[in-house]
Regions:
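Acidic, serine/threonine-rich low-complexity regulatory regions at protein termini
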Residues: 1-139, 143-308
Length: 308
């Protein structure tokens, strides 16, 4: 892999708890079109990784095809706040903003943040929550997601501390059991970040596109109304915007082949993401602060016009 390459990793759960890794160098600082095996007008993005067993190239596409079907049943739509008497979408946005900071402080993997948000929304879809308990639900879902995604999840005492001791260790343990029972222990869900990894690879993304796509996608987590869109649609739209912003064509035959969305389907989602970004609460700056650092390429200050 060339200097400056970035590795991203897809992890899928197989039978009996086995772990399947779809890991590959998705980003090259200087993409080399000659290195790809091309069939017709589309690239075989898995050809280079055929000898790497961790990339499960024999059935990686089947994993994503299954995920596209499953996201329909594991995603939520922005109607659940109508059944909440004590909280609203603004409070949800504040909670997610805080969780972005906590996630960064604990140095957790990106997928943990996306799974946390999914668990919160699915729980709120099923249970009414009081305002004082909302943060407890959030930190508990972070714990569950961490146990699922991380090698070393945060300790309970650290979660109690990060909540300024508003809840006890026992409160979190009891809420964990309650959340899992409510969700029928279904925590294996395809998130937007899961799809993003595949789409970045299909787009032969460079480091700038990766950072900008991640920035845009993280920003969607706070926007309650963007739950209208499926995770795969949001991921595809983030890649589309990032590609357009660095001067590439928004879409390509390879992206169409692997994402199964045409450009006309993605443009409305891309516009919704940028409109949500422009109208977001300026006080909720966790995502902006995160991506204003050198580690994330200072992409917060990137000008992203809506010109499509």
């Amino acid at each position: 892999m060339s200097q400056g390459a970035v590795k991203l990793e897809v992890v899928a759960k197989g039978p009996k708890g086995t772990v399947l890794h779809a890991r590959a160098p998705l980003v090259r600082s200087k993409p080399d079109p000659e290195s790809y095996q091309v069939t017709g007008k589309t690239d075989n993005i898995d050809h280079r990784d055929a000898q790497d067993p961790l990339c499960v190239t024999a059935y990686v596409q089947e994993i994503y095809t299954h995920a596209r079907k499953k996201e329909i049943t594991t995603s939520v739509r922005p109607v659940f706040m109508e059944s909440q008497s004590h909280i609203n979408e603004r409070m949800r946005a504040i909670l997610v903003d805080w969780l972005v900071e906590v996630h960064l402080k604990f140095k957790l993997v990106p997928e943990t943040l996306y799974l946390t948000t999914n668990l919160i929304d699915r729980y709120l879809e099923r249970k009414e929550v009081s305002r004082p308990k909302l943060q407890l639900v959030g930190v508990t879902c972070l714990l569950i997601a961490s146990k699922y995604e991380e090698i070393y999840p945060p300790e309970l005492r650290d979660l109690v501390y990060i909540c300024d001791r508003a809840y006890s260790r026992q409160d979190i343990i009891e809420m964990e059991e309650h959340v899992l029972k409510t969700l029928e222990y279904n925590v294996t869900v395809p998130t937007a970040h899961f799809f993003l990894i595949r789409y970045l690879k299909a787009g032969h993304a460079d480091k700038k596109i990766v950072q900008l796509s991640c920035y845009l996608l993280d920003g969607t987590l706070q926007a309650y109304h963007l739950l209208h869109y499926l995770p795969s649609q949001l991921a595809a739209a983030a890649v589309f915007i990032a590609r357009r912003n660095v001067g590439r064509n928004g879409w390509s035959p390879t992206l169409l082949n692997y994402c199964d969305y045409c450009e006309e389907e993605i443009i409305p989602v891309a516009r919704a993401i940028l409109q949500a970004k422009q109208s977001s609460n300026p006080e909720l700056r966790a995502v902006s602060k995160k991506f204003s650092t050198t580690k994330y390429g200072h992409v917060t200050g990137t000008s992203i016009p809506i010109d499509f």
